[in-house]
Amino acid sequence: MMKVLVVVALLVTLISYSSSEGIDDLEADELLSLMANEQTRKERIPKHHECTSNKHGCCRGNFFKYKCQCTTVVTQDGEQTERCFCGTPPHHKAAELVVGFGKKIFG
């Protein structure tokens, strides 16, 4: 019986050591990933800013990523140009309103 306990303790020690090595490797990979994400986050376009040249570069809002919303602008000369800005689509606004209302009620 004593031999079985020693073998089980040895196996538990080996498994915990190998899993801690794996966790350390994962933490290093996550750190590199977070640093890369931070760099791309700095390049993101904030809400209400122009996104005409980068339509997929809008930031995240509270719950959803902002969408690049475009409109056609006609100048006094009659020239049409497309202007885009990062904003919250109406259905996302409705969802955020419902969630905010639910948080106030059930808080």
Curated annotation (Swiss-Prot):
Source organism, top-level taxon: Eukaryota
Signal peptide (from-to): 1-20
GO molecular function: toxin activity
Cystine crosslinks: 51-68, 58-86, 70-84
Propeptide residue intervals: 21-41
Localization terms from the record: Secreted
Free-text tissue specificity from the UniProt record: Expressed by the venom gland.
InterPro entries associated with the record: Spider_toxin_CSTX_knottin (IPR019553)
Record flagged with keyword Transferase: no
Keyword Secreted: yes
Keywords recorded for this protein, A-Z: Disulfide bond, Secreted, Signal, Toxin
GO CC, any one term: extracellular region
Family membership: Belongs to the neurotoxin 19 (CSTX) family. 04 (U1-Lctx) subfamily.
UniProt protein name: U1-lycotoxin-Ls1g
UniProt source species: Lycosa singoriensis (Wolf spider)
Lineage of producing organism: Eukaryota, Metazoa, Ecdysozoa, Arthropoda, Chelicerata
